[in-house]
């Protein structure tokens, strides 16, 4: 890609990342300390001058040969094209299962099928991406936020099947801690973009529980209990929150 502007964001690495990238002809943007994956992406997006942004992780798992298929989708009218990894490209069964859970929940919230919510390999129209920079966190969850933001804003998004190589280097993600944080992030996004899809089922569950408990106490004790009223009141409050 001789006409491409290649930017490498060095997020506080103290190895030879920056010097080797510069020797290869890339423009290097260096953070004095590690600010996070999302912060690195935002720095690169602000510095980029092109109409199309292509983002790849720096761990060697994404293939440059797949870039053209992503960019071609933008020419077809999509605003973002994402490389969706196959099942063999995930680091272990646990990571595959966790990502599958995220994908199902995000698909339910967005109303669109999302085969790979956490993929960092994507092509996107620069002007639209930059409009959402203020929403993106500095941490690893930027792919989730930008994908959900585009889908809920009505911008066409597509997914292209890719096969990712095994990553090089050590992952800093802790499955349990970061998995819980990730679910919390998806929940926050859901409450921002589609609150009723979260709160309506919860409200319905409380309502059914309250009615069922009322029926049980009425037929067994012949009276309406305070607990039934409390559960039904909780149902109404949760619905109003949504």
Where are these regions (language model features)?
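Hydrophobic helical membrane-anchoring modules
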Residues: 136-242
């Amino acid at each position: 890609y001789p006409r491409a502007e290649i930017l490498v964001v060095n997020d506080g690495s103290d190895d030879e990342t920056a010097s080797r990238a510069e020797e290869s002809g890339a423009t290097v943007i260096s953070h004095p300390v590690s600010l996070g994956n999302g912060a690195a992406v935002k720095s690169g997006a602000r510095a980029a001058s092109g109409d199309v942004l292509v983002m790849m992780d720096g761990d060697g798992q994404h293939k440059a040969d797949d870039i053209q298929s992503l960019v071609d989708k933008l020419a077809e009218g999509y605003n973002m094209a994402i490389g969706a990894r196959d099942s063999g490209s995930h680091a272990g069964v646990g990571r595959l299962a966790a990502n599958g859970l995220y994908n199902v929940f995000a698909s339910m919230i967005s109303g669109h099928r999302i085969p790979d919510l956490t993929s960092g390999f994507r092509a996107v129209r620069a002007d639209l991406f930059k409009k959402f920079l203020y929403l993106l966190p500095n941490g690893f969850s930027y792919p989730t936020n930008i994908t959900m933001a585009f889908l809920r804003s009505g911008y066409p998004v597509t997914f292209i099947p890719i096969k990712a190589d095994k990553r090089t280097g050590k992952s800093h993600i802790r499955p349990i801690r970061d998995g819980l944080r990730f679910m919390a992030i998806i929940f926050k996004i859901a409450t921002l973009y589609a609150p009723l899809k979260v709160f309506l089922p919860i409200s319905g569950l409380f309502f059914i529980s309250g009615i069922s408990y009322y029926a049980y106490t009425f037929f067994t004790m012949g009276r309406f209990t305070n607990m039934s009223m409390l559960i039904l009141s909780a149902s109404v409050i949760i619905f109003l929150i949504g």
